[in-house]
């Protein structure tokens, strides 16, 4: 079976660099799976679950990814992001503490620009919590 070269790069390191069967993640039109020999594709990444390989395979990896960029062609998928974590490595207690702190910040009288930053951080944390809960079912 044909394989696809997946490279996930963050500002500090290469998060993943190997051959895979499929990569699935959320783009602006919804979730999309990337397979070998597919047409070229370029898009922003929406926060959500990134799945490497097929759901029930022994080498499946689930991650939570924040925003980023994806470019794919027939042979490879390249992802650039500054926010990715394996779901199994998510610390739910720490996320819930951060969520509570941000929700308390929202009750303050914040400048509009700061309010937007807090809302975006809270949205990202809620997305990670959702991904964790779906993975742990």
From Swiss-Prot:
Protein's UniProt keywords contain Glycoprotein: no
Annotated protein name in UniProt: ATP synthase epsilon chain
Source domain of life: Bacteria
Family, as annotated: Belongs to the ATPase epsilon chain family.
GO CC aspect terms: plasma membrane; proton-transporting ATP synthase complex
Membrane disposition: Peripheral membrane protein
HAMAP family: ATP_synth_epsil_bac (MF_00530)
Annotated gene: atpC
GO molecular function: ATP binding; proton-transporting ATP synthase activity, rotational mechanism
Cellular localisation: Cell membrane
Any matching Pfam family: ATP-synt_DE_N
Keyword Isomerase: no
Subunit structure of this chain's protein: F-type ATPases have 2 components, CF(1) - the catalytic core - and CF(0) - the membrane proton channel. CF(1) has five subunits: alpha(3), beta(3), gamma(1), delta(1), epsilon(1). CF(0) has three main subunits: a, b and c.
Keywords from the named record: ATP synthesis, Cell membrane, CF(1), Hydrogen ion transport, Ion transport, Membrane, Transport
InterPro entries: ATP_synth_F1_dsu/esu, ATP_synth_F1_dsu/esu_N, ATPsynth_dsu/esu_N
Intrachain disulfide bonds: none
Role description: Produces ATP from ADP in the presence of a proton gradient across the membrane.
UniProt xrefs under PANTHER family: ATP SYNTHASE DELTA/EPSILON CHAIN, ATP SYNTHASE EPSILON CHAIN, CHLOROPLASTIC
